[in-house]
């Protein structure tokens, strides 16, 4: 059975996560995709891989995803990137990191290079969907909204 934990960020915010602690070892940090969570096969597969290979493991549900607090509509890539960097800093400390990002999680993983450049040992993007923002959102925006965003 997978045991999930919660990290409090502020008075009302809780982030659900999975962690396999390994001091002085490299950590796999798995970042899920858009509107996803930690219930799928990918995070559990990478957790099992980490355990079998004596690696640390960390995965979180961004705010508004899964059982983490918050509303999905109040989130965005910048917010989830910041949450992720704070979360990694608090949990991984100075250990080296292997980032694995699925779909939007690959984008958020790439953003982590700004914060952990010297700690990142590797990166794997799975179905990184570089066009997902265009297909999911941009094409649905009115001309007025598009012009406002471009300003």
Description of each model-found segment:
Residues 101-109:
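Gly/Ala-rich beta-loop-alpha elbow adjacent to hydrolase catalytic centers
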Residues 25-33:
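Short beta-strand element of the alpha/beta-hydrolase
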Residues 43, 47-69:
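Conserved alpha/beta-hydrolase
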Residues 1-23:
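N-terminal cap/lid segment of alpha/beta-hydrolase-fold proteins
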Residues 99-101, 126:
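Short beta-strand immediately N-terminal to the catalytic nucleophile in serine-hydrolase-like folds
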Residues 107, 119-151:
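The alpha/beta-hydrolase serine catalytic core
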Residues 35-41:
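Short substrate-entry loop that stabilizes the transition state in hydrolases
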Residues 65-91:
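Catalytic nucleophile-loop/oxyanion-hole region of alpha/beta-hydrolase
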């Amino acid at each position: 059975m997978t045991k999930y934990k919660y990290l409090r960020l502020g008075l009302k915010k809780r982030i659900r996560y999975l962690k396999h602690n390994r001091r002085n070892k490299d950590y796999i940090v798995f970042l899920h995709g858009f509107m996803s969570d930690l219930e799928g096969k990918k995070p559990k597969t990478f957790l099992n891989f980490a355990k079998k290979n004596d690696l640390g493991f960390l995965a979180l549900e961004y705010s508004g995803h899964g059982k983490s607090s918050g509303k999905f509509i109040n989130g965005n890539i910048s917010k989830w990137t910041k949450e992720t960097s704070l979360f990694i800093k608090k949990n991984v400390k100075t250990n080296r990191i292997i980032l694995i990002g699925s779909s939007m999680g690959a984008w958020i993983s790439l953003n982590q290079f700004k914060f952990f450049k010297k700690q990142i040992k590797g990166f794997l993007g799975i179905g990184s969907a570089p066009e997902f923002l265009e297909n999911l959102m941009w094409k649905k925006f009115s001309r007025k909204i598009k012009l406002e965003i471009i300003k």
